[in-house]
C-alpha cells in the first residue's frame, strides 16, 4: 500500500491532536459539558486517524477485531465487577507493562522483525488492555472516589481500552 505525503502529514496532525485532546481531558478541571465536548472531538479525531485501517485491513478483519474486542471487554468487565478491590500495585504493574509494550512497539518500527513478532506484541497488548478493562471496572464500581464523579474521564478510560483491544485483535487476525 502506497501512502501519499498528504496522508502522512494528516496522520501526524491527527495523532498529535488526539494526544493533546486526551491530555486536556485527563489533566484539566473543565466543567463536564466542556470535557464532554473535548471527548466528542477526541472521538472524531481518533476516527479520522483510524481511517487508515480501512485501506490496510479487509472488512472481515475489522469486523472480527470489533467483535473480538467486544467479547474480551464483556468478559473482563465481569471479572472486574466480581473481583475484590484491585489495589494500587495492580495499576502500577499494568502501567509498567503498558510502557514496556510501547517501547517494544517503537523498537519494532525500526527493526527488521517479522509479522510473528508483531502478532506476539498484539497478543500481549490484548492481555494488558483486557486486564486494564478489569482494573478500570473495579475502580469505577468499587472506588467511586477514584474518579470523583468525573464520568467523562471514566468513559475515556473504557474508550481507550476498547480502541486498543480492537487494534490488537485486528493485527492478530490479519
Q: What residue spans do the PLM features occupy?
A:
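A hydrophobic alpha-helical transmembrane-helix feature that marks the membrane cores
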Residues: 1-174
Amino acid at each position: 500500500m502506497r501512502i501519499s505525503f498528504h496522508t502522512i502529514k494528516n496522520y501526524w496532525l491527527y495523532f498529535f491532536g488526539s494526544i493533546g485532546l486526551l491530555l486536556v481531558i485527563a489533566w484539566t478541571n473543565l466543567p463536564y459539558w466542556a470535557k464532554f465536548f473535548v471527548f466528542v472531538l477526541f472521538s472524531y479525531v481518533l476516527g479520522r486517524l483510524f481511517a487508515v485501517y480501512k485501506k490496510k485491513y479487509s472488512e472481515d478483519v475489522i469486523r472480527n477485531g470489533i467483535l473480538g474486542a467486544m467479547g474480551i471487554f464483556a468478559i473482563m468487565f465481569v471479572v472486574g465487577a466480581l473481583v475484590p478491590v484491585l489495589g494500587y500495585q495492580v495499576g502500577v504493574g499494568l502501567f509498567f507493562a503498558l510502557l514496556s509494550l510501547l517501547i517494544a512497539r517503537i523498537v519494532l518500527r525500526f527493526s527488521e522483525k517479522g509479522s510473528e513478532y508483531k502478532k506476539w506484541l498484539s497478543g500481549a497488548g490484548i492481555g494488558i488492555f483486557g486486564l486494564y478493562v478489569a482494573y478500570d471496572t473495579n475502580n469505577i464500581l468499587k472506588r467511586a472516589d477514584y474518579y470523583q464523579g468525573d464520568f467523562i474521564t471514566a468513559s475515556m478510560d473504557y474508550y481507550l481500552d476498547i480502541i486498543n483491544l480492537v487494534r490488537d485483535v485486528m493485527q492478530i487476525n490479519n
